[in-house]
């Protein structure tokens, strides 16, 4: 095994270095290696497999679709499968939650969804800066990486990561940091050196930066703050969405409505690459 990977696969790899086991089979929450050993998969594809490996009810649909020669790639042309998806998503996910979003298909990955959200926010507001929180992880392409605080990831960029401000999260500075007050002071003080951002982006539950759950009260205060200063609120649901937190959208528990929502990973259902960006109609 190691000879093939060491000789032909790039050194740019991560998880396998810490756990050099060759997998061969997966079902539900169990994965099996080539020696027959079974493991509970707590990796979960980093949130891409919320419904388990090879769930029968999705697998059957996929096989039938392929056997019927369903459309696999169509750029952004109109297709019947896309029409059915949008209709189903509207009726089953958005309307029951009183969410009036337009659905944008940005590309296959979560970082694509984040990049689109940043471009939309900057275009809509005419501002450049985006505020994110310490402990954030939003992706590995340059725009998304500029929001990410992990040092090793940022250092790998090889270029300056600009137009982003990282705000101390409430758990920072020894805990109980008044983040809202701090942001307000940055905007109200003419000598702070900061200007009003186009958007503030948040994972309601940070994962890569440690399991930090932002309180309902903080999320509500953040929504009020963004509205007060005409700042767009972006919720990154890429890893915590699709029922991973108990509700389909992780922000539901706070009863807030973000301006833009980024989705990927388990929205593909089967570990397949798929992403959405949801945006309020006035931003479209």
Question: What name fits each language-model region?
Answer:
Residues 1-284:
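Conserved N-terminal phosphate-binding loop of PLP-dependent enzymes in the Aspartate aminotransferase
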